[in-house]
Amino acid sequence: QPWIPFV
């Protein structure tokens, strides 16, 4: 799964 940064 693609990595989504927590912003």
Curated annotation (Swiss-Prot):
The modification Valine amide is found at residue 7. One of its GO terms (biological process) is positive regulation of smooth muscle contraction. It comes from the Eukaryota. One of its GO terms (cellular component) is extracellular region. Its main location: secreted. Expressed by the skin dorsal glands. The modification Pyrrolidone carboxylic acid is found at residue 1. Belongs to the frog skin active peptide (FSAP) family. Peroniin subfamily. This is Peroniin-1.2. It comes from Litoria peronii (Emerald spotted tree frog).
